Structures are given as structure tokens and as C-alpha cells.
Amino acid sequence: MLLSDRDITAELDAGRVALDPYDPGMLQPASIDVRIDRFFRLFDNHKYPYIDPAEDQPELTRLIESKPGEPFILHPGEFVLGSTFELVTLPDDVAARLEGKSSLGRLGLLTHSTAGFIDPGFSGHVTLELSNVATLPIKLWPGMKIGQLCFFRLSSPAKKPYGSGEYASRYQGQRGPTASRSHLNFVHTDVTVTDAGQQGE
């Protein structure tokens, strides 16, 4: 069930859902706006010949911080990681989804590539996967509205919420834009087995 503004306010007032800092003026009819922080993670494409999700590639990205009062310039075709200014904490029976802002989408800014879902139990700054699909550079001002969080109540509390220890929970407590940790639970699956259970020729 998608939570309304009344439900979101009730969850925040009860301390079950937390946004830090919280600005009541960011509340929308069925979501709450979030802002972009001053940290960005850039890709150093010359460090590796390719990106391999099965390997640890610690030099693939580097962290930068925008200077006070200055925007970060996202060039056409560029992909960088950012993060929400707000720290988001969810209980074990509420999940969330990050959506972009319509006004920014109309300028060619994509807020996330695929990872818009936030598990129940998560706590941390939400990493943004920012892309510029326009033909001109886009200025990203730290503190500007960058997206909106929608909240969903689960049919029952999660048996093993994010961060419970049952899962890797690789991004629990993350601060700032966090690089991929896909190598930590990468699994090579044998796909030569056919649907009938026979080895492929």
C-alpha cells in the first residue's frame, strides 16, 4: 500500500520512518522530496580496461566534494554517483522507492539507473545514479531537490529486514555516494545446463 501524506507524517512523528534532516515543507501528496548532497563519485575510466562486477576495482571511482556555493557540472553522456542529503531510516514493515523529479527529468537529468528500491530496515544516505541525457551540461546545486521518496507498507513485517545480519547488507549505514560492492556476493552460475537438466553441447 502506497502511503499518503497523512500516513508519511504519522510514521515520521512516531519515529518509525526517519529522515535526518527533516523538513516538513518537503512533503508531497504521496511522497517526500529529498535533496542532493555535496559529495560526488566520479569514474576514472582509464584505470581499468573494463568494468567487471565480479572483481573488486577500488580505483574505478574517486570521491570529490563540491566547493561551497558552487554547483557540480554534469556533462552530456556523463554518469556519476551522488547521494541524498537526508539520512533515511526505515522500519521492518515499510519499504521505499526513489523517484526522480518531473521538472528535472524534462531537463534530461536521470536520478537513478535501476536501483530505486530501498529495503525495509535500511538506514543510510541513498546513493543516486545520475545521468545527463541532454545535449548541454547540467548544474547540480548541493541542497537542491533531486528526487522524491515514496513509501510502501508491507503486508507483514519482513522476517529478515535489511541490516539484520541474515543478508550481506553491503550498503547499510552508507554515508555519501557509495561505490558498487557487487563483487562481495557475486555468484558464477553454470548456464550450460538446459531446461531439461542436461548439459548443453
Curated annotation (Swiss-Prot):
It catalyses: dCTP + 2 H2O = dUMP + NH4(+) + diphosphate. The keyword Nucleotide-binding applies. HAMAP family: dCTP_deaminase. InterPro entries: dCTP_deaminase, dUTPase-like_sf, dUTPase_trimeric. DCTP binds at residues 101-106, 119, 127-129, 148, 162, 174. One of its GO terms (molecular function) is nucleotide binding. It is an enzyme of class 3 (hydrolase). Homotrimer. Its EC number is 3.5.4.30. CDD domains: trimeric_dUTPase. The record marks 116-117 as: Important for bifunctional activity. GO terms for biological process: dUMP biosynthetic process; dUTP biosynthetic process; nucleobase-containing small molecule interconversion. Keywords: Hydrolase, Nucleotide metabolism, Nucleotide-binding. Belongs to the dCTP deaminase family. The active site is at residue 129. Pathway: Pyrimidine metabolism; dUMP biosynthesis; dUMP from dCTP: step 1/1. This is dCTP deaminase, dUMP-forming. PANTHER family: DCTP DEAMINASE. The lineage of its organism: Bacteria, Bacillati, Actinomycetota, Actinomycetes, Micrococcales. Bifunctional enzyme that catalyzes both the deamination of dCTP to dUTP and the hydrolysis of dUTP to dUMP without releasing the toxic dUTP intermediate. Pfam families: DCD (PF22769). The keyword Protein biosynthesis does not apply.
